[in-house]
Amino acid sequence: MLTHKTCQARKKMQVSFVIRDAEEKQHRNGVNALQLDANNGKLYSAGRDAIIRVWNTRTDSSEKYIQSMEHHNDWVNDIVLCCNGRNLISASCDTTVKVWNAQKGFCMSTLRTHRDYVQALAYAKDREQVASAGLDKAIFLWDVNTLTALTASNNTVTTSSLTGSKDSIYSLAMNPSGTVIVSGSTENILRIWDPRTCMRIMKLRGHTENVRCLVVSPDGNQVVSGSSDGTIKVWNLGQQRCVQTIHVHKEGVWSLLMSENFQYIISGSRDRNIIVTEMRNPSNKTLVCEEQAPVLSLGYNIDKTGVWATTWNSDIRCWKLPMYDRCTLNSSGGMDAQWTQGGTEVACIKGGAAIKECAVLNDKRYIITKDSQDQVVVYDVLRVVKKEQLGAVDYEAEVKKRNKQVYIPNWFTVDLKTGMPTIVLGQEEVDCFSAWVSIEAGLPECVDPTTEIKINYGKLLLEALLEYWTPPHSIPPNEMEPDMHGNGYFQVPKHTPVIFSEVGGRTVCRLLVRDAAGDSESTLLHETAPQWVTDVVIEKNIPKFLKIPFFLQPHPQMTKPERTKKDRLVANEFIQCRKVCEHVLEKVLNAETTPSGGNANNSLQNSQSDANSEGSQLPAEERIELWCNDVVVDPNMDLRTVRHFIWKQSTDLTFQYKTKQNFNYDGSIGDSLERVTRKY
């Protein structure tokens, strides 16, 4: 027995997991942010696949991958390197800010102060201070030295907040000395604070759409902003006004990078262009390159002769920067200024494909996906593995070909936001315990021909995902009874990430399948796992069967239609129609039945009629024919499949029965047909 902690105020929970390889060396979706450690040439990239990756930019080899930093479970929106490259701070759509050991790549602590997506970070190098902001309109200030000192026992941290924002914040910037912090939001204005006092200084109007990117000058006197309105604006904080508006892009400006002397702006846009512009003379501009997708972030290479760029795609490219040369002699003997040639791709870190389409097959076990490179793949949701790589085949044709005429209730949903298939289990709109199937249909490789076992997909999967979880304070099993872990049929990959989160809300816990055996993880699961999970995984309770009511009546062509009244019955929805045939023979026609295989259902026991008759040795489905909506029903179909594909009505399912030509019955129907609701 396990005493599970419950909380009346706890929000409804869901469990999700990702079907993926043990090591994902390539980004599988767009890359939102970059940070370069110029001391060792390491480039950190924040992916929409929820993974931060580290690359060696000093090698000319195509294999630049060093390691992955994994603990987020949604887009990583921003990252900053601090403490001379020893630590990294990240912000994510999973509503958390995380502190990392940048050298070893592990998560040191998680900050859960934000209540919505955390979109942006800002860093004051001289003060070792970080600010975070997001869609909850909040800005929090963090002391980095305090964050990096957090431990399991010393896990209390205080933060200062900057108030006054009235809308979602998408951009944030501080100068190195930490005297000015600026935010940009869907208010279309810039708000400025003094982070030393948390006092609001001013707000600046001028943009007409969301302010997506910001840079503050080292002295804190100037701010450069980029907006979805397509403009770049230069602001003088002393004058509290815009002093320059630059129009070099056709669409929104999403990323800005400044030269060290704050004279040149490198901008990346939704129009896919990266442009260098002289700030004081915007007519002096040049196109660095046209990327393959909208530009999300920019960062210098080690010697600042090139710029790394990320986009909606998963590749990371480095482009040579043109230089502005003022020492060119013109034909009249004067001096001209012109740009040297740039725009050459000098390096590329290749990314992987993102899954863009997904179809759940009717058997509700397999899904078929199509990625950004048109590759089609079949995944086994139950076993959490990639089953088959089909290549660049016709996606729609494969879905149609592999869909069987079988109906199983939806028991999971699929989320493709990260570019990898994330499977979500819950108890809300989709009940993860709704899919009962026969073991023959669900796990044919585990079939024992002497049994008619029914399995529940959701129960089996949760047991496999939490196989290694031994809750604290659980009573040791009886020595005569084995301590059952897992589901007894199969295991899932140990590297699979499992996430517990609030429905439509925040992440509460993330761990790998193999890590559930750890003491801290076990305790965290004990405090986090919802009751519906512990009921099946720990208490080994059986989910409830779903019932279907239906009517049974003689077919008009019956030889002896003595009884025409409908009789209403109720059965488990996964009961196959051959069981209904057995019921007709046994209870309606008073004939002896031979079960179709295995042990008959308790409510469908053999009658006591003559067992020596030749007809009684035939299975019921060879003696009785079931009809529904003027269609002969396959005896292998279950009730829910008949209702979905043949009946197709909201009213109770109705069957008509008649004997086949090779079978005649002499029994009197009489009172053998039950007039009351019968449960199978």
UniProtKB/Swiss-Prot annotation:
InterPro entries reported in the protein's UniProt record: G-protein_beta_WD-40_rep (IPR020472), WD40/YVTN_repeat-like_dom_sf (IPR015943), WD40_repeat_CS (IPR019775), WD40_repeat_dom_sf (IPR036322), WD40_rpt (IPR001680), WDR48 (IPR051246), WDR48/Bun107 (IPR021772)
GO BP annotations listed: double-strand break repair via homologous recombination
Repeat (WD) residue spans along the chain: 26-65, 71-110, 113-152, 164-203, 206-245, 248-287, 290-329, 350-389
Domain of life: Eukaryota
Pfam families membership: DUF3337, WD40
Repeat in keyword set: yes
Region annotation (Disordered) ranges: 592-616
Alphabetical UniProt keywords: Repeat, Ubl conjugation pathway, WD repeat
GO molecular function: ubiquitin binding
Subunit comment: Catalytic component of the Usp12-46 deubiquitylase complex consisting of Usp12-46, Wdr20 and Uaf1; regulatory subunit that, together wtih Wdr20, stabilizes Usp12-46. The Usp12-46 deubiquitylase complex associates with arr/arrow; the interaction leads to deubiquitination and stabilization of arr/arrow.
Function: Regulatory component of the Usp12-46 deubiquitylase complex. activates deubiquitination by increasing the catalytic turnover without increasing the affinity of deubiquitinating enzymes for the substrate. The complex deubiquitylates the wg/wingless-signaling receptor arr/arrow, which stabilizes the receptor and increases its concentration at the cell surface; this enhances the sensitivity of cells to wg/wingless-signal stimulation.
Family: Belongs to the WD repeat WDR48 family.
Protein name, per record: WD repeat-containing protein 48 homolog
Organism listed in the record: Drosophila sechellia (Fruit fly)
